[in-house]
């Protein structure tokens, strides 16, 4: 077993040897790509599903509330550990709203149906197309809406779907903070973060600053950084340009109430299985 920045041999191409100087898992690569090298640095990748990972440096912290302890990487002879939470349904929810419900023609178009303040007129969405991931780990539960009336609009339904993604993220960060893992901001990447309204909603729900890189391909950048470190090339000159989303303090109480209502709906749904 080698370090991420070890010597993995050579790839022979056109009679030339190309050295392989870096190997790292995809989510760990995104962690490195986002520059999460210190304890409490956290990234979240929003694609079909969502993968959150927070660096705990040389301390393998065990959390017995549905989150996983894993190795982040070994670089420069130093092993860093991480805590990971996996959310099963994110981008596939938006795809379902587009392809099955026919609410909009493109994922980009979904943004205009979002209420940036998170208001859904009491509609809640359980995002369990394939069960629930962290921290619930329930493969039997299935998705559903609650609170729909004859006055419910497409905006309410679409916003409730996006809220469910934010609330799953908040559930994980809340558990982390119970274990004294301080998270000042969240660095996010993946296809969904192109939706600026979602990023602001996520910031409001978590009551934390959300940072998105201008180049959202953090996994590829992370793998490149590992190879650069192995080749003794300075990574500090790489672009660190970020977009920032700060929470709207006037919505804090409303978002806490919405989150608590969503948690109650999820808990009751799990109990009925």
Q: Can you name each region flagged by the protein language model?
A:
Residues 102, 230-273:
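Acidic, glycine/GT-rich loop-and beta-edge segments that sit at the periphery of enzyme/chaperone cores
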Residues 30-33, 87-88, 163, 200-203, ...:
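Glycine-rich phosphate-binding/hydrolytic loop that grips phosphoryl groups
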Residues 1-78, 89, 105-112, 119, ...:
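ATP-dependent carbohydrate kinase catalytic cores
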Residues 74-83, 146, 206-212, 240-251:
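Short beta-alpha connecting loops at secondary-structure transitions
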Residues 18-22, 83-87, 99-100, 135, ...:
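Hydrophobic alpha-helical scaffolding
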């Amino acid at each position: 077993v080698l370090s991420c920045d070890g010597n993995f041999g050579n790839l022979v191409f056109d009679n030339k040897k190309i050295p392989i100087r870096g190997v790292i898992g995809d989510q760990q690569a995104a962690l490195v790509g986002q520059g999460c090298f210190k304890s409490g640095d956290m990234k979240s990748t929003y694609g079909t599903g969502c993968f959150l990972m927070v660096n705990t440096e040389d301390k393998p912290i065990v959390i017995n509330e549905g989150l996983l302890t894993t190795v982040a990487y070994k670089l420069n002879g130093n092993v860093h550990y991480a805590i990971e939470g996996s959310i099963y349904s994110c981008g596939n929810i938006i795809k379902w709203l587009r392809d099955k419900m026919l609410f909009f023609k493109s994922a980009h178009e979904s943004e205009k149906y979002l209420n940036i303040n998170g208001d859904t007129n009491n509609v809640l969405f359980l995002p369990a197309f394939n069960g629930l991931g962290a921290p619930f780990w329930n493969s039997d539960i299935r998705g559903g809406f609650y609170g729909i009336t004859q006055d419910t609009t497409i905006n309410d339904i679409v916003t409730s779907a996006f809220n469910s993604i934010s609330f799953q993220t908040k559930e994980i960060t809340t558990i982390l903070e119970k274990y004294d893992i301080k998270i000042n901001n969240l660095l996010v990447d993946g296809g969904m973060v192109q939706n600026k309204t979602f990023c602001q909603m996520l910031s409001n729900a978590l009551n934390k600053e959300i940072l998105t890189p201008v180049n959202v391909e953090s996994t590829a950048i992370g793998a490149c950084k590992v190879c650069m470190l192995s080749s003794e090339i300075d990574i500090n000159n790489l672009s660190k340009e970020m977009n920032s989303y700060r929470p709207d303090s006037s919505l804090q109480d409303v978002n806490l109430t919405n989150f608590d209502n969503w948690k109650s709906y999820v808990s009751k749904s799990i109990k009925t299985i």
